[in-house]
Amino acid sequence: MEPAGIAYHNSDPYFTIFKIPQWRADLYKFLSVTFWGGLPGNLQRSISAFYSRVYDKPFTKYIIAPYIRYYYRDPNYKDKFLPPEGKEDFGSFQDFFIRRFKMLPVSNSPWVWPCEGLLCDEGKVHEFGTSKVKSDIRTIETIFGVSKGDIPPAYCFTNVFLHNKNYHRIHAPVSGTITRIQHIPGDLIVLRPWIYKQNPSLPAFRNERYNIDITDNKGRIWYLSVVGGPGVGSIKLPKSITLDGFVEKLDELALFYLGSTCCMAAPEHPKYHHKNTFVEVGASY
Protein backbone atom coordinates (compact mmCIF):
# COMPACT_ATOMS: atom_id res chain seq x y z
CA MET A 1 0.00 0.00 0.00
CA GLU A 2 1.28 3.44 -0.88
CA PRO A 3 2.04 5.72 2.07
CA ALA A 4 0.27 9.05 2.32
CA GLY A 5 1.71 12.01 0.50
CA ILE A 6 4.03 10.10 -1.83
CA ALA A 7 5.17 12.46 -4.59
CA TYR A 8 6.06 9.90 -7.23
CA HIS A 9 6.60 12.59 -9.87
CA ASN A 10 7.57 15.43 -7.50
CA SER A 11 4.83 17.68 -8.81
CA ASP A 12 5.21 20.16 -5.91
CA PRO A 13 1.51 20.99 -5.35
CA TYR A 14 2.10 23.16 -2.29
CA PHE A 15 1.31 26.86 -1.97
CA THR A 16 0.59 29.37 0.78
CA ILE A 17 -2.87 29.19 2.34
CA PHE A 18 -3.67 32.72 3.39
CA LYS A 19 -5.25 33.40 6.76
CA ILE A 20 -7.12 36.65 6.42
CA PRO A 21 -9.32 38.46 8.96
CA GLN A 22 -13.07 38.11 8.64
CA TRP A 23 -13.59 41.71 7.52
CA ARG A 24 -11.20 41.23 4.61
CA ALA A 25 -12.80 37.92 3.66
CA ASP A 26 -16.19 39.65 3.69
CA LEU A 27 -14.85 42.42 1.44
CA TYR A 28 -13.32 39.98 -1.05
CA LYS A 29 -16.50 37.92 -1.03
CA PHE A 30 -18.55 41.05 -1.76
CA LEU A 31 -16.29 41.99 -4.68
CA SER A 32 -16.36 38.42 -6.02
CA VAL A 33 -19.97 37.40 -5.49
CA THR A 34 -21.93 40.66 -5.47
CA PHE A 35 -19.91 42.98 -7.73
CA TRP A 36 -18.19 40.65 -10.23
CA GLY A 37 -20.86 37.95 -9.89
CA GLY A 38 -23.53 40.58 -10.54
CA LEU A 39 -22.21 41.23 -14.03
CA PRO A 40 -23.90 39.34 -16.89
CA GLY A 41 -22.35 35.92 -17.43
CA ASN A 42 -21.46 36.70 -21.05
CA LEU A 43 -19.54 39.79 -19.94
CA GLN A 44 -17.66 37.79 -17.31
CA ARG A 45 -16.67 35.24 -19.93
CA SER A 46 -15.63 37.91 -22.44
CA ILE A 47 -13.37 39.63 -19.91
CA SER A 48 -11.95 36.28 -18.80
CA ALA A 49 -11.31 35.22 -22.40
CA PHE A 50 -9.45 38.49 -23.08
CA TYR A 51 -7.36 37.97 -19.95
CA SER A 52 -6.64 34.39 -21.00
CA ARG A 53 -5.60 35.42 -24.54
CA VAL A 54 -2.92 37.73 -23.14
CA TYR A 55 -1.12 34.66 -21.80
CA ASP A 56 -1.13 33.15 -25.28
CA LYS A 57 1.15 35.93 -26.55
CA PRO A 58 4.75 34.90 -27.34
CA PHE A 59 6.26 37.52 -25.00
CA THR A 60 4.67 35.77 -22.00
CA LYS A 61 7.09 32.84 -22.35
CA TYR A 62 9.62 35.05 -20.57
CA ILE A 63 7.41 34.90 -17.47
CA ILE A 64 7.96 31.15 -17.13
CA ALA A 65 11.52 31.14 -15.73
CA PRO A 66 10.94 33.71 -12.95
CA TYR A 67 7.57 32.09 -12.20
CA ILE A 68 9.28 28.74 -11.63
CA ARG A 69 11.94 30.33 -9.43
CA TYR A 70 9.25 31.94 -7.29
CA TYR A 71 6.78 29.07 -6.95
CA TYR A 72 8.74 25.81 -7.18
CA ARG A 73 11.51 24.33 -5.09
CA ASP A 74 13.01 22.46 -8.05
CA PRO A 75 14.69 24.87 -10.53
CA ASN A 76 14.33 22.15 -13.20
CA TYR A 77 10.61 21.71 -12.58
CA LYS A 78 9.72 22.41 -16.23
CA ASP A 79 11.86 19.48 -17.40
CA LYS A 80 9.30 17.05 -15.97
CA PHE A 81 6.67 18.22 -18.45
CA LEU A 82 5.88 18.48 -22.14
CA PRO A 83 4.23 21.42 -23.93
CA PRO A 84 0.62 20.92 -25.09
CA GLU A 85 -0.15 18.61 -27.99
CA GLY A 86 1.16 19.79 -31.34
CA LYS A 87 3.90 22.01 -29.90
CA GLU A 88 7.59 21.32 -29.49
CA ASP A 89 8.30 23.99 -26.88
CA PHE A 90 6.61 26.28 -24.39
CA GLY A 91 5.94 29.25 -26.65
CA SER A 92 3.84 31.18 -24.14
CA PHE A 93 2.89 31.14 -20.49
CA GLN A 94 -0.39 29.48 -21.44
CA ASP A 95 1.60 26.59 -22.91
CA PHE A 96 3.29 26.14 -19.54
CA PHE A 97 -0.03 26.45 -17.73
CA ILE A 98 -1.54 23.53 -19.69
CA ARG A 99 1.65 21.45 -19.58
CA ARG A 100 1.52 17.65 -19.83
CA PHE A 101 3.38 15.12 -17.71
CA LYS A 102 6.20 13.38 -19.55
CA MET A 103 5.23 10.29 -17.57
CA LEU A 104 1.99 9.88 -15.66
CA PRO A 105 2.31 8.67 -12.07
CA VAL A 106 1.98 4.95 -11.43
CA SER A 107 -0.40 3.77 -8.73
CA ASN A 108 -1.47 0.33 -7.54
CA SER A 109 -4.58 1.79 -5.94
CA PRO A 110 -7.88 1.15 -7.79
CA TRP A 111 -8.85 4.81 -7.24
CA VAL A 112 -6.70 7.92 -7.23
CA TRP A 113 -6.92 11.69 -6.96
CA PRO A 114 -7.92 13.18 -10.33
CA CYS A 115 -6.07 16.47 -9.91
CA GLU A 116 -3.49 18.46 -7.99
CA GLY A 117 -4.14 21.16 -5.41
CA LEU A 118 -5.60 21.98 -2.00
CA LEU A 119 -8.35 19.77 -0.62
CA CYS A 120 -10.42 22.70 0.62
CA ASP A 121 -13.65 20.85 1.45
CA GLU A 122 -14.39 17.25 2.40
CA GLY A 123 -17.14 15.27 4.12
CA LYS A 124 -20.11 12.96 3.64
CA VAL A 125 -22.77 14.33 1.31
CA HIS A 126 -25.43 14.33 4.04
CA GLU A 127 -23.21 16.47 6.29
CA PHE A 128 -23.45 19.44 3.96
CA GLY A 129 -26.39 21.77 4.33
CA THR A 130 -27.83 24.11 1.74
CA SER A 131 -26.35 27.19 0.11
CA LYS A 132 -28.25 30.27 -0.98
CA VAL A 133 -27.24 31.34 -4.48
CA LYS A 134 -29.08 34.25 -6.13
CA SER A 135 -32.14 33.63 -3.94
CA ASP A 136 -32.13 29.89 -4.77
CA ILE A 137 -31.51 27.23 -2.12
CA ARG A 138 -29.03 24.69 -3.45
CA THR A 139 -27.61 21.39 -2.22
CA ILE A 140 -24.45 19.43 -3.02
CA GLU A 141 -26.37 17.71 -5.83
CA THR A 142 -26.73 21.12 -7.50
CA ILE A 143 -23.00 21.18 -8.21
CA PHE A 144 -23.23 17.93 -10.14
CA GLY A 145 -26.44 18.83 -11.96
CA VAL A 146 -28.58 16.07 -10.43
CA SER A 147 -31.65 16.11 -8.19
CA LYS A 148 -31.54 16.05 -4.41
CA GLY A 149 -31.26 12.45 -3.23
CA ASP A 150 -29.68 11.15 -6.44
CA ILE A 151 -26.26 10.96 -4.78
CA PRO A 152 -26.20 8.50 -1.84
CA PRO A 153 -25.91 10.42 1.45
CA ALA A 154 -22.92 8.34 2.57
CA TYR A 155 -20.90 9.31 -0.52
CA CYS A 156 -17.88 11.51 0.15
CA PHE A 157 -17.82 15.03 -1.29
CA THR A 158 -14.42 16.58 -1.99
CA ASN A 159 -13.40 19.90 -3.51
CA VAL A 160 -9.83 20.47 -4.70
CA PHE A 161 -8.79 24.05 -5.41
CA LEU A 162 -6.16 24.37 -8.14
CA HIS A 163 -3.82 27.30 -7.63
CA ASN A 164 -2.34 28.94 -10.74
CA LYS A 165 0.92 27.09 -10.05
CA ASN A 166 -0.76 23.68 -10.06
CA TYR A 167 -0.97 21.21 -12.93
CA HIS A 168 -4.28 21.96 -14.66
CA ARG A 169 -5.34 18.73 -16.31
CA ILE A 170 -8.01 16.54 -14.73
CA HIS A 171 -7.71 12.75 -14.90
CA ALA A 172 -10.04 9.82 -14.30
CA PRO A 173 -9.98 8.77 -10.63
CA VAL A 174 -11.10 5.25 -11.52
CA SER A 175 -11.53 2.99 -14.54
CA GLY A 176 -15.08 2.80 -15.85
CA THR A 177 -17.69 3.89 -18.35
CA ILE A 178 -18.68 7.52 -18.89
CA THR A 179 -22.42 7.52 -18.28
CA ARG A 180 -23.14 11.27 -18.31
CA ILE A 181 -21.54 14.46 -19.65
CA GLN A 182 -23.22 17.75 -18.82
CA HIS A 183 -22.26 21.39 -19.36
CA ILE A 184 -23.75 23.95 -16.96
CA PRO A 185 -23.32 27.62 -17.92
CA GLY A 186 -22.78 29.96 -15.01
CA ASP A 187 -20.71 32.70 -13.45
CA LEU A 188 -16.94 32.86 -13.06
CA ILE A 189 -16.59 34.17 -9.51
CA VAL A 190 -13.26 33.97 -7.66
CA LEU A 191 -12.40 30.44 -6.53
CA ARG A 192 -9.93 31.05 -3.68
CA PRO A 193 -11.44 29.16 -0.73
CA TRP A 194 -10.02 31.36 2.03
CA ILE A 195 -12.41 34.19 1.15
CA TYR A 196 -15.43 31.91 1.69
CA LYS A 197 -14.58 30.88 5.23
CA GLN A 198 -17.80 29.04 6.09
CA ASN A 199 -18.49 27.70 2.61
CA PRO A 200 -15.30 27.16 0.56
CA SER A 201 -17.30 25.34 -2.13
CA LEU A 202 -19.63 28.29 -2.83
CA PRO A 203 -18.16 29.00 -6.32
CA ALA A 204 -18.90 25.42 -7.40
CA PHE A 205 -22.63 26.03 -6.87
CA ARG A 206 -22.80 28.91 -9.33
CA ASN A 207 -19.81 28.83 -11.70
CA GLU A 208 -19.64 27.37 -15.19
CA ARG A 209 -18.76 23.69 -15.05
CA TYR A 210 -18.64 20.34 -16.82
CA ASN A 211 -20.06 17.34 -14.99
CA ILE A 212 -18.81 13.87 -15.85
CA ASP A 213 -20.11 10.63 -14.33
CA ILE A 214 -17.97 7.48 -14.38
CA THR A 215 -19.58 4.14 -13.51
CA ASP A 216 -17.00 1.69 -12.16
CA ASN A 217 -16.89 -2.11 -12.46
CA LYS A 218 -19.03 -2.42 -9.32
CA GLY A 219 -21.80 -0.32 -10.85
CA ARG A 220 -21.05 2.66 -8.61
CA ILE A 221 -21.15 6.20 -10.02
CA TRP A 222 -18.26 8.58 -9.43
CA TYR A 223 -19.51 12.14 -9.92
CA LEU A 224 -16.98 14.75 -11.08
CA SER A 225 -17.53 18.46 -11.60
CA VAL A 226 -14.85 20.49 -13.38
CA VAL A 227 -15.47 24.09 -12.31
CA GLY A 228 -14.15 27.24 -14.00
CA GLY A 229 -13.21 30.58 -12.47
CA PRO A 230 -12.14 34.11 -13.50
CA GLY A 231 -9.58 34.15 -16.27
CA VAL A 232 -10.72 30.80 -17.64
CA GLY A 233 -10.65 31.11 -21.41
CA SER A 234 -12.27 27.71 -21.70
CA ILE A 235 -12.62 24.24 -20.24
CA LYS A 236 -11.83 21.60 -22.85
CA LEU A 237 -12.61 17.90 -22.92
CA PRO A 238 -10.48 15.57 -25.07
CA LYS A 239 -12.20 14.13 -28.14
CA SER A 240 -11.86 10.68 -26.57
CA ILE A 241 -14.22 11.65 -23.73
CA THR A 242 -17.59 10.57 -25.07
CA LEU A 243 -20.83 9.27 -23.62
CA ASP A 244 -20.67 5.48 -23.09
CA GLY A 245 -16.92 5.55 -23.73
CA PHE A 246 -14.56 3.63 -21.45
CA VAL A 247 -11.77 5.37 -19.55
CA GLU A 248 -8.84 3.84 -17.75
CA LYS A 249 -7.74 5.22 -14.42
CA LEU A 250 -5.66 8.39 -15.02
CA ASP A 251 -6.92 8.94 -18.57
CA GLU A 252 -7.26 12.68 -19.17
CA LEU A 253 -10.80 14.03 -18.71
CA ALA A 254 -10.41 17.81 -19.06
CA LEU A 255 -8.01 20.73 -19.04
CA PHE A 256 -8.37 24.35 -17.95
CA TYR A 257 -7.05 27.48 -19.60
CA LEU A 258 -6.37 29.39 -16.34
CA GLY A 259 -8.21 28.93 -13.03
CA SER A 260 -10.18 25.97 -11.74
CA THR A 261 -11.47 23.71 -9.00
CA CYS A 262 -12.53 20.07 -9.17
CA CYS A 263 -15.35 18.58 -7.10
CA MET A 264 -16.10 14.89 -6.70
CA ALA A 265 -18.77 12.80 -5.00
CA ALA A 266 -17.40 9.29 -4.60
CA PRO A 267 -18.47 5.96 -3.08
CA GLU A 268 -15.06 5.70 -1.40
CA HIS A 269 -13.58 8.03 1.22
CA PRO A 270 -10.01 9.40 1.20
CA LYS A 271 -7.63 7.21 3.22
CA TYR A 272 -4.67 9.53 3.54
CA HIS A 273 -5.95 13.06 3.05
CA HIS A 274 -8.28 15.40 4.90
CA LYS A 275 -9.48 18.97 4.58
CA ASN A 276 -6.73 21.56 4.06
CA THR A 277 -4.10 19.06 2.90
CA PHE A 278 -2.57 18.92 -0.56
CA VAL A 279 -3.28 16.17 -3.08
CA GLU A 280 -1.52 15.10 -6.28
CA VAL A 281 -2.62 13.50 -9.53
CA GLY A 282 -2.38 9.74 -9.16
CA ALA A 283 -1.91 9.71 -5.38
CA SER A 284 -3.97 7.02 -3.65
CA TYR A 285 -7.44 8.37 -2.95
Predicted ranges, named:
Residues M1-Y285:
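Contiguous, well-folded functional domains in the mature portion of proteins
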